Curated annotation (Swiss-Prot):
Protein's recorded name: Glutamate--tRNA ligase
EC number: 6.1.1.17
Enzyme's top EC category: ligase
A Gene Ontology cellular-component term: cytosol
Family of this protein: Belongs to the class-I aminoacyl-tRNA synthetase family. Glutamate--tRNA ligase type 1 subfamily.
Catalyzed reactions per annotation: tRNA(Glu) + L-glutamate + ATP = L-glutamyl-tRNA(Glu) + AMP + diphosphate
SUPFAM superfamilies xref list: An anticodon-binding domain of class I aminoacyl-tRNA synthetases, Nucleotidylyl transferase
Principal location listed in the UniProt entry: cytoplasm
Organism: Nostoc sp. (strain PCC 7120 / SAG 25.82 / UTEX 2576)
Annotated compartments: Cytoplasm
Residue ranges annotated as motif 'HIGH' region: 9-19
Length: 480
């Protein structure tokens, strides 16, 4: 079998983490089998679909490394195909025009609710006579088109994740609406219908999507049969849950891929984490995967049925591993946009070699790329604010004299090197007859504003290169 899969997001919002995880599983399955990964944009909801969301979806997939082989195909450009399919079902007597009003449907639901029954359409317009239909039209009623569902029919399929699945037609809520009211005789085709037409037309072999689509699958199998088409294999993957076990939603904070990027997650770290959201590798001790490596191992036998809890701590850890193993030049490229977004100026001697030195200093401490913004602030501002501990340090006996001695020693240096910096510290310790700790703490506070921070000597060298060490030493002396 030639494997052909698709990811089919709706451009009614930015690329969601759940959609992205589904895309990951589709991509992995396609690559594992040497198949084709197709991008289809399901934009039949013309009122809510936006081109900016389409762009966000495509940009997000590319950023994650999920490049597609065919597409993007837009449902809004395929309406003729869907309308012909609706007409075919009408002509075959498998679908009909339903003129039931919204008020009548609401009354039906209320009556069923009062009896403790599940809401369902009662198929009242399935057998309208031409005269009845003409009367409804004369009343100005609009229609929807419904596909006939046999209540006695049992729908069975072997789900690649969940095993045997079985639904009865009576569980599907009555005859299914496949097109809503519009100006033409075939209506405006709806999601559950058009996805089947697309999957048939694109020869999709496997439909891989979230478990919240299981009820849709039962309905769609009936549509495949109505068109005499081959039914694809289905794999319904677990939902992504929050740590309390509820479906991950906007109430839990960030849910779109562009937000994760803005928060400082790397594409590699995020896609690695999504790969493990519901799938277990053969080697349970292996947690770091490239997409290509995961594709070699990916099977649905190792996809869990239970929901996958979204663990921020695990994502942070994975992300940090990718950051720590990214070469300095590449990491610099990743960090520059975050510095620019924070308004940091890269002028004043902050050239590429200087930036790479800064990245080398900070990289081991980064969990997210955004961490570099706060950690590096002292290297992009003319002055620093003293912390409470820093202020106390500068008031200690001997701090002012130590800083004055460092300034004097700096005047003898044409260029500060690591060796020269170490020599100055030794010279001040000896000359002032103080402990090295006092010198190091006083110097750190003067340069960084705090008693804690990145490597002191490397920080000093970076500040010296852009001419900020002496002004800060003088400012610290003034308040000591």
């Amino acid at each position: 079998m030639t494997v052909r899969v698709r990811i089919a997001p709706s451009p009614t919002g930015n690329l969601h983490i759940g959609t992205a995880r589904t895309a990951v599983f589709n991509w992995l399955f396609a690559r594992h089998h040497g198949g084709t990964f197709i991008l289809r944009i399901e934009d039949t909801d013309l009122e809510r679909s936006r081109p900016e969301y389409t762009e966000n979806i495509m940009t997000g997939l590319r950023w994650l490394g999920l490049n597609w082989d065919e597409g993007p195909f837009f449902q809004s450009q395929r309406l003729d195909l869907y309308q012909k399919a609706v007409k075919q079902l009408l002509d075959q007597g498998l679908a009909y025009r339903c003129y039931t009003t919204s008020e009548e449907l609401e009354a039906l639901r209320e009556g069923q609710k009062a009896k403790g029954e599940a809401p369902r359409y009662d198929n009242r317009h399935r057998h309208l006579t031409p005269e009845q239909e003409a009367e409804f039209k004369a009343q100005g009623r609009s229609f929807v088109i419904r596909f006939k569902i046999d209540d006695e029919r049992e729908i069975v399929w072997n789900d690649l994740v969940r095993g045997k699945m079985s639904w009865r037609g009576s569980d599907l809520g009555g005859d299914m609406v496949i097109a809503r009211a519009s100006e033409n005789d075939t209506g405006q085709p709806l999601y559950n219908f058009v996805v089947v037409i697309d999957d048939i037309d694109m020869q999709i072999s496997h439909v891989i999507r979230g478990e919240d689509h299981i009820a849709n699958t039962a309905k769609q199998i009936l549509l495949y049969e109505a068109f005499g088409a081959k039914i694809p294999e289905f794999a319904h993957t677990p939902l992504i849950l929050n740590m309390e076990g509820r479906k991950l939603s906007k109430r839990d904070g960030v849910t779109s891929i562009s937000d994760f990027k803005q928060m400082g997650f790397t594409s590699e770290g995020l896609v690695n984490y999504m790969t493990l959201l519901g799938w277990s590798p053969p080697d349970s001790t292996q947690e770091i995967f490239t997409l290509e490596a995961a594709a070699k191992e990916f099977t649905f036998e190792r996809v869990n049925k239970a929901g996958a809890k979204f663990d921020w701590a695990k994502l942070d850890w994975l992300n940090s591993q990718y950051i720590h193993n990214t070469p300095v030049d590449q990491l610099t490229d990743l960090l520059i946009p975050y510095w620019e977004a924070a308004g940091y100026s890269l002028a004043g001697g902050r050239d590429r070699p200087w930036l790479e030195q800064l990245v080398g200093l900070l990289s081991a401490s980064l969990t997210r790329l955004t961490d570099a913004v706060d950690m590096s602030k002292l290297f992009f501002t003319e002055t620093v604010e003293l912390s409470e501990e820093g202020s106390k340090q500068l008031q200690q006996e001997g701090s002012k004299a130590v800083l004055e001695a460092i300034i004097a020693a700096l005047e003898t240096q044409a260029q500060l090197t690591e060796t020269a910096a170490q020599d100055i510290i030794k010279q001040v310790v000896k000359g002032q007859n103080v402990k090295k700790g006092l010198v190091m703490r006083s110097l750190r506070v003067a340069l960084t504003g705090d008693v804690h921070g990145p490597d002191l000597i490397q920080s000093w060298l970076l500040l010296n290169q852009i001419g900020l060490d002496k002004p800060r030493l003088n400012q610290a002396i003034a308040v000591s």
